[in-house]
């Protein structure tokens, strides 16, 4: 018995490993894996079904077909273990060795491995520095290659055609060596001296100046170095021995009817063996060269097809015309090994069923059908039955369960008690898609789900199905209970707000019971407390909505956290008093003393969680739900057709609109407006009419007139069912009610453009045929869009998870003082997101000072929770520098301080939390709610685009930043800087509004002046860009020659004449080199200098500029010298929604990006070329000027002689994130991406915390390009992990050496995922072949740092509870201990079980 136990133990031993290395296999290595050579293409004997000897399924090579039984049947049973049968040569052992024993094929002629040949860039080609075409011609026997030139004039690696070879043979005889086929390439690779080659290349690299050559050399050096360091030999890329996969991994299964189902690999192997054997025979027969050559080529093709079918030429197809699945196809793609079997597995102990609602369940419970539970918990039941002695054997227990005896149900109840199960609903878009519940046994066959968790699962009860999983081990149960229980997941990890929020019926019920009604039954009563309120309501003495006075006792926490009672008489309603009974102690009465809509309820639960913690919140949420359901049922709110009240005014509004449209149609026909203008105006008219109708309708629905106690009429909020549903947030919205009772309004065509005839009817009136037809358009597009959206959103999530999966919190504090400056998000006159929302849950990077003093308000490294944020608001702090993941200094992972609060728990984040995946899920999960389409701006929107003034909304003082200005003759400020911002500051110093002020704007109010709300503070002409003089004097034209550089135009309407500068394309040859300009001179004719510089005031005019002044006129500073017409951008489509988010994360360059100044200096224009102009920026310090060619059609924002700072916009357009990173740094690009992504989500009303986007940005910035190597081993221009450069530089500086300088790179998420250090993770993401080829050549080690790699190799992930396990393992490895077997300590009940087990197994240790 003992040795059997020992033997069983030995069978299940696992290897401890820290990393996985991939490399090229040498022929000897392949032979060492092999258990014998496969010589014949036969598989199994079709009569005996026994494997053929030396065939592809040979039992002698690969092992026995039956457990412990040789093929001929001489040796059977366990006792012959390890015997090799002398008759059939089969070792007696387990069958499962047929899954691991490999064979090999000795190839008669070497063949190239197609991956290293054809996977671009071709490794063989790069190593030999030969073009791929040439190598292929040699390999497939079309030309010769010279291997050794000898004393002849032939170069090594020179390609010779058949004729050239024969000529050379005649000329030189055997002085030279030339071959064809893989042997030739093998010989070339073998004879390479890698180190020598490296030296030569490095010397060449230092001498060369051409950029392309440098790139090529760097690539080759990297490859050669990889070969030298990894110990791979180049000739191993040519196969001489082919490994054969174990037969159970390419099975051959007999089907009924004498046919076989087989894996495609067997066919591919058969071809290789057939051709190989034929080639051997031909070589033995010394057949003519041409025949042998053909056979060798066929062998090469067969091996290619086996390794990667279809990569070269046409794919080899099977009998049914479909391409065969080769080894490469087995591992790549969604159905490949990585994604199908390693990252996702099917699990036992699971079941699935339809879900129904369980409104009586507690939040931590779910209803599990008895039948399902019996099946899922079978092993536990068997164990219990045996333990109780109710069944003698497992078999007996099985019978009892199958018969469903009464005692089995009692046992099931015990087993299930406090044994959580996991419920999962596909698609699992975020971590709340799997939660743990305690099962409650129910009759029936559907799983019952608690209504409050539906929001997290995005579940409804229209036929959704869910899966149940049983956590088996104690650890798993503990984790399910402590971390995954639905009661522990009240807050959403995406934004830290409650996700267990009542919706629909519950909201309606609570809203109904907290509404008040004038003159309801029982109004004016004074009640002793909520209990009495409930009694009189039940007795029918008072209505739920009656306004009454009630004695209420509130509890409030004092400084020590003790509850203090306050009792007072409150004006409230009966319903609110009843609701107060379930509100936990510690919350103020004001929280329920209002009509509770969905928002208010959410806020109530949030407050409860923040003040009282988890347990009261859970109980409260449950109670709210029961109460809500109860009162919704009592309310009897239902929808009837009479609830949809159509406003009387509707008819006249529509006829007015029709009249206006007719008028515009007339104007169009008489030619006063263009077709485009007419269309836009018509749409505007209808949109306005629609708004008026819906306003009339809502006013009508919102209020009703009632008679109060004194007999006067009074308006009160309506009790119309439809209105109540929308107002409470239970279901429906104003827009939907508008379609029911107002008018349906304008519809869009499938391409997004708006149809100009609206649907004037509503659903209550009914649609006519035409209106119905127009409606179907939009409806179908909606469905098609949704389908596309889901797929796109899923793919975005996958890319995000892949890029961020290895980011885990690994230390407490990295000690950095860096951070990002947080300011409120203000667009125009609205605060889109106040500062408190942005800094809540972040850690301060430096002390926050009280504004205007040196007092420290919040010290550095403080986690800002709600109370701190209140303090910041009270002191009207405007900007806070907070720690951010992007600037975190931790090498691998991030530190807790830089991340801040764990949003789903409300305290600082724990070590080991997988923040990368959480971030990816939080951004990806709402992806399906984003729109797919690009918006066409039309109608109202396009008119708003051409703004011409700034009007402030609130009163306050004006603050201008980045401003240069001059005062014009009327004493007003004129802005002469490019990126001026105007902020409105209230009396507390908080920014309320923020606007961009364009160049040439005239300010009505100056910096620091007070303004009233609604005042206009700046004006400008939106259609032209002025040239403004900064000095006063007289104008002197230079190079302004009529007919050559300028032309005179007269306006027909006004009769005024103006000069227009000709574009260089329109000028005559004489005028090409002239630079028209306006010079400012004083009365004596001397140049006037620009103030603060020694440059004369001279304004060069670009083409198309209009000058309305004459030569010699007097002007004063701030006057407009010329105007440059702005071509309005037309209606540019804004990419919105999901595509925009994808573009940002993929860091795609926009079509016509803004041109930014690369250096600071003075702008001038050099010699123009055809279609381009040369922009020159000369730095003030006299270093080299920077030149850039800019297409002529780009509109420039700068004039000659203007000073720009680095990163200033020279030509407008969407900014490219790479430029922002290069010119303005990491923080600027972070701010840009975060704000742009947030804009898209904010538009859809989705809240995501900034830090999730920052996490992704950190991962996009994880590579750096080396600029100068210093004393490091990096190559110039090489792209390396940022963390590696940091570590290397730290070591170099510690030894007093020079570190490498580098610039950060911004990679798109797909690129970043593929560029990770871990090849396993990259290979399982995309482009598997390329990743594996690259890794194998370089002999890469995968340190298994990320989550994905560890899932693939089947270990605990280094995050969450697995983080501690890995830390512990590392510590043990460092100390050199053996891993201790984990001591199982459960409750005392299982201690006796442990004793029993130890007694059984302990005997084997003490020999």
Curated annotation (Swiss-Prot):
GO terms for biological process: DNA-templated transcription. Pfam families: RNA_pol_Rpb1_1, RNA_pol_Rpb1_2, RNA_pol_Rpb1_3, RNA_pol_Rpb1_4, RNA_pol_Rpb1_5. Zn(2+) 2 binds at residues 814, 888, 895, 898. Mg(2+) binds at residues 460, 462, 464. Its cofactor is Mg(2+); Zn(2+). One of its GO terms (cellular component) is DNA-directed RNA polymerase complex. Disulfide bonds: none annotated. It catalyses: RNA(n) + a ribonucleoside 5'-triphosphate = RNA(n+1) + diphosphate. One of its GO terms (molecular function) is DNA-directed RNA polymerase activity. Zn(2+) 1 binds at residues 70, 72, 85, 88. Keywords: DNA-directed RNA polymerase, Magnesium, Metal-binding, Nucleotidyltransferase, Transcription, Transferase, Zinc. Binds 1 Mg(2+) ion per subunit. Its EC number is 2.7.7.6. HAMAP family: RNApol_bact_RpoC. DNA-dependent RNA polymerase catalyzes the transcription of DNA into RNA using the four ribonucleoside triphosphates as substrates. The RNAP catalytic core consists of 2 alpha, 1 beta, 1 beta' and 1 omega subunit. When a sigma factor is associated with the core the holoenzyme is formed, which can initiate transcription. PANTHER family: DNA-DIRECTED RNA POLYMERASE (PTHR19376), DNA-DIRECTED RNA POLYMERASE SUBUNIT BETA (PTHR19376:SF54). Belongs to the RNA polymerase beta' chain family. This is DNA-directed RNA polymerase subunit beta'.
């Amino acid at each position: 018995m003992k040795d059997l136990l020992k033997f069983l133990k030995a069978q299940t031993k696992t290897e401890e490993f820290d990393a996985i290395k991939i490399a090229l296999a040498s022929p000897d290595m392949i032979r060492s894996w092999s258990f014998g050579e496969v010589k014949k293409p036969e598989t199994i004997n079709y009569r005996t079904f026994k494997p053929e000897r030396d065939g592809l399924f040979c039992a002698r090579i690969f092992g026995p077909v039956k457990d412990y039984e040789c093929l001929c049947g001489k040796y059977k049973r366990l006792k012959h273990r390890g015997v090799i049968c002398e008759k059939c040569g089969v070792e007696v052992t387990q069958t499962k060795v047929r899954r691991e024993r490999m064979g090999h094929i000795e190839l008669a002629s070497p063949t190239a491995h197609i991956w290293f040949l054809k996977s671009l860039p071709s490794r063989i080609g790069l190593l030999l520095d030969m073009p791929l075409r040439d190598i292929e011609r040699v390999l497939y026997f079309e030309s010769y290659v010279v291997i050794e030139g000898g004393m002849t004039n032939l170069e090594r690696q020179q390609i010779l055609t058949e004729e050239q070879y024969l000529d050379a043979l005649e000329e030189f005889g055997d002085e030279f060596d030339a071959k064809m086929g893989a042997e030739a390439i093998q010989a070339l690779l073998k004879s390479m001296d890698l180190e020598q080659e490296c030296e030569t290349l490095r010397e060449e690299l230092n001498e060369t100046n051409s950029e392309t050559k440098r790139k090529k050399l760097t690539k080759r050096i990297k490859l050669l170095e990889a070969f030298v360091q990894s110990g791979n030999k180049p000739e191993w890329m040519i196969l001489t021995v082919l490994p054969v996969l174990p037969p159970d991994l390419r099975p051959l299964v007999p089907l009924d009817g004498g046919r076989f189902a087989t894996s495609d690999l067997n066919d591919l192997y058969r071809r290789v063996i057939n051709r190989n054997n034929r080639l051997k025979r031909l070589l033995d027969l010394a057949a003519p060269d041409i025949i042998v050559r053909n056979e060798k080529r066929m062998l090469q093709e067969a091996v290619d097809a086996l390794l990667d079918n279809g990569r070269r030429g046409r794919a080899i197809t099977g009998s049914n015309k479909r391409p065969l699945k080769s080894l490469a196809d087995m591992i790549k793609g969604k159905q490949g090994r990585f994604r199908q079997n390693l990252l996702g597995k099917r699990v036992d102990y699971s079941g699935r069923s339809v879900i129904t609602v369980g409104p009586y369940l507690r939040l931590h419970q779910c209803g599990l059908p008895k039948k399902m539970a019996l099946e899922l918990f079978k092993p536990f039941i068997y164990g219990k039955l045996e333990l109780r002695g109710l069944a003698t054997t497992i078999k007996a227990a099985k019978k009892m369960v199958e018969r469903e005896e009464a005692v089995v149900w009692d046992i099931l109840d015990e087993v299930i008690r406090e044994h959580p199960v996991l419920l999962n609903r596909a698609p699992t878009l975020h971590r709340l898609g799997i939660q743990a519940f305690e099962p409650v046994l129910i009759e029936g066959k559907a799983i019952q789900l608690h209504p409050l968790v539906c929001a997290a699962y995005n579940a409804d009860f229209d036929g959704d199905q869910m899966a149940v999983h049983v956590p088996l081990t104690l650890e798993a149960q503990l984790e399910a209970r402590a971390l995954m229980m639905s009661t522990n997941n009240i807050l959403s990890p995406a934004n830290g707000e409650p996700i267990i929020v009542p919706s629909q019926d519950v909201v309606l019920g609570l809203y109904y019971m907290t509404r008040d009604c004038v003159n309801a039954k029982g109004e004016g009563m004074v009640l002793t407390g909520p209990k009495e309120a409930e009694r009189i309501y039940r007795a029918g003495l008072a209505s739920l909505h009656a306004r009454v006075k009630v004695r209420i006792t509130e509890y409030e926490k004092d400084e020590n956290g003790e509850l203090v009672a306050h009792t007072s008489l409150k004006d409230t309603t009966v319903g609110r008093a009843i609701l107060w009974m379930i509100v936990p102690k510690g919350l103020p009465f004001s929280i329920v003393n209002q009509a509770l809509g969905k928002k208010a309820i959410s806020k109530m639960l949030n407050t409860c969680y923040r003040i009282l913690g988890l347990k009261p919140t859970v109980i409260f949420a449950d109670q709210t739900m029961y109460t809500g359901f109860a009162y919704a049922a009592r309310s009897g709110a239902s929808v009837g057709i009479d609830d949809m009240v159509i406003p009387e005014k509707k008819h006249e509004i529509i006829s007015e609109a029709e009249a206006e449209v007719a008028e515009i149609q007339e104007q169009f026909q008489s030619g006063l407006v263009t077709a485009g203008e007419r269309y836009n105006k018509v749409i505007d008219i209808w949109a306005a009419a629609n708004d008026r109708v819906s306003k009339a309708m809502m006013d009508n629905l919102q209020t009703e007139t009632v008679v109060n106690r004194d007999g006067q009429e009074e308006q009160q909020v309506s009790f119309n069912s439809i209105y109540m549903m929308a107002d409470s947030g239970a279901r429906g919205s104003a827009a939907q009610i508008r379609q029911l009772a107002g008018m349906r309004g304008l519809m869009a065509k499938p391409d997004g453009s708006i149809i100009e005839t609206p649907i004037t009817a509503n659903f209550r009136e009914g649609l006519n045929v035409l209106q119905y037809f127009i409606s179907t358009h939009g409806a179908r597009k909606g469905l098609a869009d949704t389908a596309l959206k889901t797929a796109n959103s899923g793919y975005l999530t996958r890319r995000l998870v892949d890029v961020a999966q290895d980011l885990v919190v690994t230390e407490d504090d990295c000690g950095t003082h860096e951070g990002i400056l947080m300011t409120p998000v203000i667009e125009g006159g609205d605060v889109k997101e106040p500062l408190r929302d942005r800094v809540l849950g972040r850690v301060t990077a430096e002390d926050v000072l009280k504004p205007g003093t040196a007092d420290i308000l919040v010290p550095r490294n403080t986690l800002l929770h709600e109370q701190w944020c209140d303090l910041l608001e009270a002191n009207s702090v405007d900007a806070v520098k907070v720690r951010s993941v992007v600037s975190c200094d931790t090498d691998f992972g991030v530190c807790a301080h830089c991340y801040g609060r764990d949003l789903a728990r409300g305290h600082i984040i724990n070590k080991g939390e997988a923040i990368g995946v959480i971030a990816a899920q939080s951004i990806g999960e709402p992806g399906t709610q984003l729109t797919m389409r690009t918006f066409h701006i039309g109608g109202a929107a396009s008119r708003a685009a051409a703004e011409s003034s700034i009007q402030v909304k609130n009163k306050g003082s004006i603050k201008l930043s980045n401003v240069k200005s001059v005062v014009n003759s009327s004493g007003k400020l004129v802005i002469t800087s490019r990126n001026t911002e105007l902020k409105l500051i209230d009396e507390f110093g908080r920014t309320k509004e923020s606007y961009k002020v364009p160049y040439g704007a005239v300010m009505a109010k100056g910096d620091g002046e007070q303004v009233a709300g609604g005042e206009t503070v700046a004006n400008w002409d939106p259609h032209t860009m002025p040239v403004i003089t900064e000095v006063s004097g007289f104008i002197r034209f230079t190079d302004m020659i009529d007919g050559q550089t300028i032309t005179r135009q007269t306006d027909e309407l006004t009769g005024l004449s103006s000069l227009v500068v000709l574009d260089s394309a329109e000028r005559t040859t004489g005028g090409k080199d002239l630079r028209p300009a306006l010079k400012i001179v004083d009365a004596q004719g001397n140049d006037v200098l620009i103030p603060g510089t020694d440059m004369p005031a001279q304004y060069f005019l670009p083409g198309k500029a209009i000058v309305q002044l004459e030569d010699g006129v007097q002007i004063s500073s701030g006057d407009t010298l010329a105007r440059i017409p702005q071509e309005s951008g037309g209606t540019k489509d804004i990419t919105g929604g999901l595509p925009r988010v994808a573009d940002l994360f993929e860091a795609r360059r926009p079509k016509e990006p803004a041109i930014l100044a690369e250096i600071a200096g003075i702008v001038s224009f050099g010699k123009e070329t055809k279609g381009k102009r040369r922009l020159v920026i000369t730095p003030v310090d006299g270093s080299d000027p920077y030149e850039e060619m800019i297409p002529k059609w780009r509109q420039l924002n700068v004039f000659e002689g203007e000073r720009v700072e680095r990163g200033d916009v020279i030509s407008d357009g969407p900014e490219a994130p790479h430029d922002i990173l290069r010119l303005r740094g990491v923080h600027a690009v972070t701010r840009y991406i975060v704000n742009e992504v947030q804009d898209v989500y904010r538009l859809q009303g989705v809240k995501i915390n900034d830090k999730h986007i920052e996490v992704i940005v950190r991962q996009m910035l994880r590579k750096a390009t080396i600029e100068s190597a210093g004393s490091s081993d990096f190559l110039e221009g090489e792209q390396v992990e940022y963390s590696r450069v940091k570590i290397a530089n730290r070591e170099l500086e510690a030894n007093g050496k020079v570190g490498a300088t580098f610039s950060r790179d911004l990679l798109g998420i797909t690129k970043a995922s593929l560029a990770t250090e871990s090849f396993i993770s990259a290979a399982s993401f995309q482009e598997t072949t390329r990743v594996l080829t690259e890794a194998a050549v370089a002999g890469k080690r995968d340190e298994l740092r990320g989550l994905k790699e560890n899932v693939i190799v089947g270990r605990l992930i280094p995050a969450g509870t697995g983080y501690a396990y890995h830390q512990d393992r590392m510590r043990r490895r460092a100390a050199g201990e053996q891993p201790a077997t984990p001591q199982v300590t459960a409750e005392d009940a299982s201690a006796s079980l442990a004793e029993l087990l130890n007694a059984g197994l302990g005997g084997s240790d003490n020999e």
